[in-house]
């Protein structure tokens, strides 16, 4: 497939998912916090699996990075009040304050752009970092709020259930994506060979997420995953 056509398909799929979440939140079918986390969880695997449509040419990663870049620019414009988009504000903010988009969601988009350009599908390091951000950190808030469990002594805002969900959510999502990449021939198999290194990445990301880095865990979790990835892959 042409890299330009792959980019068009990726952009359409990503925007359709975001608009679906905006619509659901605006209709009141789910609260804004849940919508925000569903966007957090779902965007990553959708985007990374779209990489498989791209041919192995140098321009592919740059064109692919345009998708999160354009969406991140939109986040910034909405957060700054330059563009009015009440549906997006409701879906991506905790309290309805557009300025919240300039923190977590903006950092989220920036990490996607950087990791796409630096690692792309040529490296095993980038995908676990993104999946720990999505499947780990994203699921933690939902599980932590719904499952009653003891709080962490070193971080009272975090819970045991939330931290366990970071580990297992990120691990499972990473292995799921790796399995598809192995099946598609993009990564060498078997997928079981990735279990141990992904476990180390998930453990490190879980420890970092358990610390109280308010509003910047969208940076700290993938960065920690990248550092560990360099050691284990």
Task: Please tell me what each predicted stretch does.
Residues 1-5, 19-63, 76-176, 180-231:
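Interhelical loop and helix-boundary elements at the membrane-water interface
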Residues 66-75:
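Selected alpha-helical membrane-embedding segments in polytopic membrane proteins
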Residues 14-17:
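Glycine/aspartate-rich loop-and-adjacent alpha/beta segment that forms the canonical ThDP
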């Amino acid at each position: 497939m042409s890299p330009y056509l792959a980019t068009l398909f990726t952009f359409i799929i990503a925007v359709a998912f975001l608009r679906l979440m905006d619509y659901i939140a605006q209709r009141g079918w789910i609260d804004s916090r849940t919508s925000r986390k569903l966007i957090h969880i779902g965007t990553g695997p959708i985007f990374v699996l779209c990489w498989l449509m791209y041919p192995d040419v140098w321009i592919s990663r740059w064109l692919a990075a345009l998708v999160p870049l354009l969406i991140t620019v939109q986040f910034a414009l909405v957060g700054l009040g330059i563009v009015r988009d009440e549906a997006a504000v409701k879906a991506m903010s905790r309290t309805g304050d557009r300025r919240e988009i300039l923190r977590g969601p903006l950092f989220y988009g920036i990490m996607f752009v950087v990791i796409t350009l630096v690692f792309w599908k040529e490296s095993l390091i980038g995908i676990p970092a993104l999946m720990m951000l999505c499947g780990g950190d994203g699921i933690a808030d939902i599980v932590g709020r719904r499952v009653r469990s003891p709080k962490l002594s070193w971080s009272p805002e975090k819970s045991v259930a939330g931290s366990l969900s970071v580990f297992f959510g990120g691990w499972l999502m990473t292995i799921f994506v790796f399995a598809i990449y192995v099946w598609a021939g993009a990564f060498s198999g078997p997928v079981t060979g990735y279990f141990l290194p992904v476990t180390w990445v998930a453990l490190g990301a879980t420890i970092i997420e358990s610390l109280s880095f308010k509003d910047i865990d969208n940076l700290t979790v993938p960065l920690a995953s990248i550092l560990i990835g360099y050691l284990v892959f």
